[in-house]
């Protein structure tokens, strides 16, 4: 049976691929290892023998999305944050900043989509609407009327899908 592995995070920070020996084992066991960026692939190859660098098993498929012409007339004065509501994703930065922004800009609103059971970061404002988890279709509908999408991850995110989806 073929085994295909897809990395969309930093391989050196993930259990099962932190050590050189673990990554060599993955190369031996997998038919293909797909990365979402050259950066992710290069991180995977860190300290590996030169023989692995040119392996045909390793390929990069960059993130993509169907794009449509954006109708700016349908955009509203909405600032949106989508993702895990934790410090790693920068929700604490967004939360404290959005309160100031909303206080200074009375005609703007903010929407937060996501959840996080481990961290309880709470921000309250009468024009801050925290929706919790939403399915992908609902998120895309909200992005279509959003003027500003905020992605403020703290960690080395190879390529966050949220930024791609909000731009398409």
Language model regions located:
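Conserved donor-binding/catalytic core segment of Leloir-type glycosyltransferases
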Residues: 34, 71-89, 95-99
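A short, active-site helix/loop in glycosyltransferases that binds the activated sugar's phosphate group
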Residues: 17, 23, 29-56
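Glycosyltransferase donor-sugar binding loop
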Residues: 82, 95, 108-122
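Acidic donor-binding loop of glycosyltransferase active sites
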Residues: 144-158
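Nucleotide-activated donor-binding/catalytic signature segment of Leloir-type glycosyltransferases, i.e.
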Residues: 114, 118-141, 148
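Short alpha-helical segment that forms part of, or immediately flanks, the ligand-binding pocket
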Residues: 140, 163-168
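Short beta-strand->alpha-helix junction loop in the catalytic core
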Residues: 10-11, 39-40, 57-70, 117
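Active-site proximal beta-strand in glycosyltransferases
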Residues: 1-13, 34
């Amino acid at each position: 049976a073929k085994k295909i592995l897809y990395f969309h995070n930093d391989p050196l920070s993930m259990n099962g691929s932190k050590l050189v020996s673990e990554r060599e084992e993955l190369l031996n066991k997998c038919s293909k290892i797909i990365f979402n960026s050259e950066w992710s692939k290069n991180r995977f190859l860190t300290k590996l023998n030169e023989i692995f660098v040119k392996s045909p098993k390793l390929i990069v498929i960059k993130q993509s999305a169907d794009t449509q012409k954006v109708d700016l007339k349908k955009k509203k004065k909405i600032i949106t944050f989508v993702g895990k509501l934790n410090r790693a994703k920068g929700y604490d930065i967004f939360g404290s900043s959005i309160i100031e922004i909303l206080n200074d800009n009375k005609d703007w609103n903010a929407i937060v989509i996501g959840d996080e059971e481990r961290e309880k970061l709470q921000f309250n404002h009468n024009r801050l609407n925290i929706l919790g988890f939403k399915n992908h279709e609902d998120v895309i509908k909200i992005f279509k009327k959003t003027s500003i999408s905020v992605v403020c991850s703290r960690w080395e995110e190879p390529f966050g899908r949220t930024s791609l989806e909000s731009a398409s």
